[in-house]
Structure formats: C-alpha cells, structure tokens
Amino acid sequence: MPTNIHADLKIYEIIQRFPQTQWVFVTNGLGALVTDDAMRVLAPFLTLGTALKSRFINIEAFIDMLEDTITRNPVIDTPGLVSMEAQKDLSLLGLMPCGLKMPFSRAFSQFLNELQAKEGLCIQAAVEGNVNQELSYYSYVDTIESKDELPDIIVSADFNVFLGHRFYNRFVVPGHFTAYSALPAGPNFSDAQILDPENEYTILCVNPLVVVANLDKLKNRDLPHTWDDILAPEWKKSLIIRGGDGFYCHAVLLPTFKASGNKGIEALAANVLEGLHPAQMVNRIDNNGPGALYVMPAFFADRIRHQERIKVIWPDDGALASPVILQVKSEKKEELKPVLDYLVGSQLAQILAGAGFPVPHADVSAEVQTKPLKWLGWNFLRQNDLPALNVEIDKVFMPLAP
C-alpha cells in the first residue's frame, strides 16, 4: 500500500492518516510530539523532517519504520457489542468514556492483531462508548445470575453497577472476579488514594472532570477555585453538567453528596441551568450560548475552538476522578495473561495519558500526571450501595433540576 510519507509532511497529517504509527514516535523518544496537547498545538505545524533532525534521528530509517508499521498493522477498530447476550462469548468487553473509546479501540485492536500473529491467540473483544450503554447495559447486568453470562475481562467507566453491592456480593466476594495486579501509584494517584487497597478492582485510568468558565458570561462574579465554590447561590441557573432526558451525571452528584449531603445536592440542583452531553457543551461555548460554568471531562475542554473565551479551572481540591476499572475472572488470569499485561502496562498507559486520562503508572510522563485528583474513597464506595444511593440522590436532585 503506497503511503507517500515524506519528510515535509506535518506530524499531525501522519497521525491522522495513519494513527497506528503513534507508537513509532513514542518508542523512539518522540512521544511528546503525539500527545493530545501536542496534536492540537504543535503537530499541525511541525514537519517530520524538522522533528527528526532536531533529535538526530535518521529520516530514511524512521520513514521505513513508519511504512512497515502501516503495512503490518492496518487500522481496524475493535467491534462494538452485538447484543447483551453475546457478551458471554467475549474475552473482553470495554465500556469506555467518550474521548477514550477511539484511541483505546485502535490501540487494543492493533495489539490483538500482533498477538494473533505472534502467538496464535485469538481474542473476541467488543468496545463500546459508555454513554451508549449507561442505562440499558447496566440494568441488564443487574439481572445476571451466573459469572458464565459475563465476559472474561470487563473494563467499565464511571461509578457503575460493577461497584454496587449486588455485583460485589455475588461475583467479587466469592472471588469470581478480581483485580489483575497492584500497580505502583504515581503522586497524584497516591495522594488521592485512588488504587484499591483490597486489590479487588484495578484502576486503569480516570476521566478527570474540570470546570470550564465562559468568561463572557461571568457578570463580575469571581471564578470558582474549589468544587464547593460552584454551589454558591451566585451561580444560580448558571451551571451546565452532563445530563439530559431525566438523567444527570453521578460522577458529579456523588462527590457533592459525600462532601455536603442533601444540602449540597439541593444547592447544586438550584445552580444547574441544563444537562448536556460534553460534546454539546463544546458547541454551546463555541456559539457563546447560555451558561457561565460547565463541568466536563478535561478531554472535551481541549476541544473548544474559542480558547480565548474560556478559563479551564482544575480545582484546587482536584479534578473529579471518574474511574475506568478492570475486573477479570480469577480462573482466566493465567490464560489471558498477555492481554492483561498489555492492559495494565506502560505502553497502553502512555496512550491513555496522552489522550488526557491520568493513569496510576509512576513511570508515565504527561501533563495530566502532575495535577491533583479528587476521589470518592474506597470506604465510601464499599459502605454505600451505589445504585441504591444514586436513586436516593436523584429523589432530592431531580425535582429541583431543570
């Protein structure tokens, strides 16, 4: 397949056309050029030749590596979930947050292709956006009676049913599902105590939620610096969080309840103007529509075109850390060891962090790795049955919210 890669191509053009080449850059010490931030700011203007010359890397040899990677690893995204019942035949089901589905799916698909070629191991996997399954799939999980109805490896996003007491008591306590390995935590994960001390759940990464202020809509109000600040009465009907169609994001509601109880939930509801998907929030800000403050994943904050209009606030008490969790059937750990090693390894972690999702790995370098995180806490997660608690929170929040 002709690639037409040459030294005058911009790095952005190469990665956009051939995303499977990202790891050629990373493994040759050029990972900083293909992070999410660099792809937005630097890569659209930096040519391949200039980047390689500045690091004394042979251009012809590097292009050969790029072309070899493209030939051996055509981009094939991991397929989605065909049906609820089909999950029992899967080695892995991934329910990923928006923003992570595509980079995870492509990287994992490339890994599976290499695994099959090298070791003859064929893995059945499906990757879905968590938002597509948030209501339907998690309700279905609550009807499952046997571990045989579930995939061998489950990767899921947010504070979901897998952390609820029914799943925990039925599948985790008896040892049917467990974590894979205890990862050494970097400073932000260690400070927030995000890793499970009981080693029953593996945290692959977290989706950090931040506050984005539309400076045109502040009306002389001071910018918030903590999560408690956005509950102040001055922000009445000024706040937009993820939600819509009778649903609001519990990754925001749960920490508010933990910190301030029902009074905090009432204050939050009074300040919410509307519930939107983060992509809709980006549109709203770019069109300078209503709303002064937006709670959204940091990934989406970087996609706002009118950066001059906004202030991204990483709160002093940390971005809200919404987890991406891995669980595996205990009986499958040895059989699926190559897959599990990849999922918790530094290679995938660098991709996740580069996409704006902090990882526990102390050896991974990215801007998000240095910023504080705010975690619900494992005592809170184990003491409370999250699905039941979410219902109780909604009883207070929903009648007061738009």
Residue ranges of model-derived segments:
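Compact, charge-rich alpha-helical regulatory domains located at protein termini
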Residues: 1-66
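Early extracytoplasmic/lumenal segment of secretory-pathway proteins
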Residues: 74-164
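Extracytoplasmic ligand-binding site segments that recognize negatively charged/polar headgroups
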Residues: 80-109, 157-286
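Extracellular/periplasmic juxtamembrane helices and adjacent flexible linkers that interface
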Residues: 85-87, 334, 342-402
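Alpha-to-beta junction loops
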Residues: 147-156, 237, 287-296
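A ligand-binding cleft/hinge motif common to bilobed small-molecule-binding domains
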Residues: 161-163, 291-310
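Periplasmic-binding protein-like
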Residues: 193, 266-275, 307-330
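A bilobed periplasmic-binding-protein/Venus flytrap-type ligand-binding module shared by bacterial periplasmic
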Residues: 210-217, 321-334, 351-355, 361
